[in-house]
């Protein structure tokens, strides 16, 4: 007899509207669980693999060189602590980053990163199979560009329907969770993890990481990291930005929202990148109803709330998502992102012109911006970046002045936000042949635009 096809295993945390009240219920069907994963993780070979993963891209940092100098001793000590269940997290090093906005990043010692890589290597592949298809953050073969492509594919479908029937309009609901990483409830997160992880040793280790007694991660409502005194921080909420386990927990936590929207509300055009959610529909009323259901689900089940960026608009206005402004017909960088790229290109051009940056390093930096620009319609921005490059570097070389002999005053735009400059024909550099401009730009790693040479 043919084998009976097993129904897909899934765990759905959903709400049912009964007597004007929401009730949380767990629906378990053929659920797969993890057992004895802690003992498998606690081996010298596994820690050595995790060590190699943790040092990728930063192996020459002093902290990592110091640990690598006595690698066997360090891994043996770590293995002993894990086997005896006496492992404790080290102290966090805290600092602020300002891109894309002010964030408090918490960095852990390198030995703790090895442990987190061991946890990640066993837990994330298991949970990744349960996630919905249209969750794109911190997943293999996903990412921001894939998310932008999928959303634009949906917009093109909606645009074709509007062309066939002009009376049908399509709208989008943009959901943005307020201070997501600072508001994740520890008890709810641990309850979600316990459903699938049936290993007490692993749960004890995860609880030590989540409920770290030496560090607070949560912010009270209405506060930002920079204006909240440390004594007012909360110890029962929040996750440290910068931890590998934090991005994994963030996806697991909001997977409950994904399952609720897809299986309970029946939303087909739903896409999420970390805490940014976009939903498409032909009915404004339907979007408002979904928004109310989602907001109540977040408040009562996940102890989260939406911020004032949440909005319902026509898709013809474009959608801000993963750093781009996306339409059905084209895609542009957000204005704030374009201003930041212009500002950074001015800085690296200035550093190259005075000899503070090598050409190889300049090419690497320029290639990273090129990687962003090739995924959107950026003809005007490429022209402006090429103009900046010529004004800072090529002018000096054409005048026969060595880069190390000249000090160019640092532009004011490096300290303040600059406005996007339109490249008018009357302030372009002198026309050159297309071949000369293309060759110079390729050598420097800058995207060549035919406008600069008159082509």
Task: List the model feature ranges, each with a label.
Residues 72-102:
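Active-site-flanking structural segment that lines cofactor/substrate pockets
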Residues 74, 81-82, 154, 158-274, ...:
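Conserved polymerase palm-domain catalytic core
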Residues 283-305, 332-335:
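Helical (often loop-to-helix) elements that flank the catalytic cores of nucleotide-handling enzymes
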Residues 424-427, 440-441, 448:
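Intrinsic-disorder-associated, low-complexity terminal segments enriched in Asp/Asn/His/Tyr and depleted
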